Amino acid sequence: MTIKSLELETVCGITSKLPQHDKIEMAFWGRSNVGKSSLLNTLWNRKSMARISSQPGKTQTINYYNINDLCYMVDLPGYGYAKISKEIQAKWARMIERYLDTSNALRVVFLLVDIRHEPTAKDVETYQMLFKKGFNPLIIATKADKIKKNVRNKNISKKFLTNFKTYDKVMELCQTRTRRTLTNKQ
């Protein structure tokens, strides 16, 4: 898809009401600092539309990006490590749960996982929770440009396919630094 217009249209915090609209939504979710915002910037061919940081927990709101006035790409706060209190993390979790449970426009959830490491228990738990909620999450393996190709292929077969047993879709390998997306059919 050629992006002709891109706008951060809605930002929802912990107590915000979620927007009602008639466009489809695609959500991007994963552990804190997994590269969600970097991936979005790469997909959009923009350097800093979605704010990025080396500090985990930079995205603290649900951010709705309007693409060509046709759909929304939704950047969700990461789960796991962040330099915030457990209380705030619990509020984020409830905010995301509310979004997943109430958005009638959400069609797909892209679950981002760092390919350099084995998926965490929280990654697997999140994947299973999405299935229980009726979603068929598409896993995107991020940070592929930070490891060698042979290690990357080994990690897919050993770490990813073992941990995501019900997963039979296309695994996307993303290299945001080189702006390349590689497809590896399993």
Language-model-detected regions and their locations in the chain:
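Nucleotide-state-sensitive switch-loop elements of NTP-binding domains
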Residues: 79-101
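Canonical P-loop GTPase G-domain recognition
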Residues: 2-17, 145-186
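Conserved C-terminal guanine-recognition region of P-loop GTPase G domains, centered on the G4
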Residues: 71, 93-168
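Structured catalytic cores of enzymes that bind and process phosphorylated ligands/cofactors
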Residues: 26, 33-34, 40, 63, ...
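Conserved G1/Walker A P-loop phosphate-binding module
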Residues: 1-86
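Short, glycine/charged-enriched secondary-structure capping and boundary segments
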Residues: 22-23, 41-44, 86-89, 124-128, ...
